[in-house]
């Protein structure tokens, strides 16, 4: 293991690995943000009184959770390129190759996958809120939006935090899959460094350490958030 390969500047790959780590964090954060949005919308659909919305939510979670994330990435990447070419040809007569933006593809695919898992977490959290609290809010004249903001969301968020922490960990690790379509994050940088220097162990053990550090730091953050959310709550 040659640690000199990890130094900064032209003589090493330290700065490239740092940029790859930053890209991983950015992709994971964006994907998690949109995943929570997808999860909230589809959780609401699965809790709806309308069967069509419940069916839509069931189809989304079943399909996305039943298909490998890598396959979703390939389908969206190559299917997105085909769709863009079709639109460009129909509107402007352009017949050349159009490559969809890799960052957008990566965030879209990972957020769709994260959203499927977040859907079930949020749905379970909403169902865990004691019905008596909702009835009490109704009895004192709270409207639907006020009940949602003052009763349902704060309580459901407390129940959802542990599961959403797991969704974040999955999302962070899934960013490594985007390297197959060319996005330069940690794994892509490690692969390029390994191929260039013929020292694969050095770069992959470095990627291992970076992912472990990111995972550990974010895990501590979620534990602190859970502790804050449960302040004043009696332990059963």
Curated annotation (Swiss-Prot):
InterPro entries for the chain: AA_ABC_transptr_permease_3TM (IPR010065), ABC_transp_permease_HisMQ (IPR051613), MetI-like (IPR000515), MetI-like_sf (IPR035906)
GO function terms (MF aspect): transmembrane transporter activity
Membrane topology, from the record: Multi-pass membrane protein
UniProt entry tagged with the keyword Membrane: yes
Family matches, as CDD domains: TM_PBP2 (cd06261)
Keywords attached to this entry: Cell inner membrane, Cell membrane, Membrane, Plasmid, Transmembrane, Transmembrane helix, Transport
Disulfide bonds: none
Pfam families in the cross-refs: BPD_transp_1
Transmembrane segments: 25-45, 63-83, 102-122, 199-219
Principal location: membrane
Cell compartments where the protein resides: Cell inner membrane
PROSITE patterns referenced in this protein's UniProt entry, alphabetically: ABC_TM1 (PS50928)
Entry superkingdom: Bacteria
NCBIfam families from the UniProt entry: HEQRo_perm_3TM
PANTHER family: CATIONIC AMINO ACID TRANSPORTER, MEMBRANE COMPONENT
Family affiliation: Belongs to the binding-protein-dependent transport system permease family. HisMQ subfamily.
Protein name according to UniProt: Nopaline transport system permease protein NocQ
Organism placement in taxonomy: Bacteria, Pseudomonadati, Pseudomonadota, Alphaproteobacteria, Hyphomicrobiales
Primary gene name: nocQ
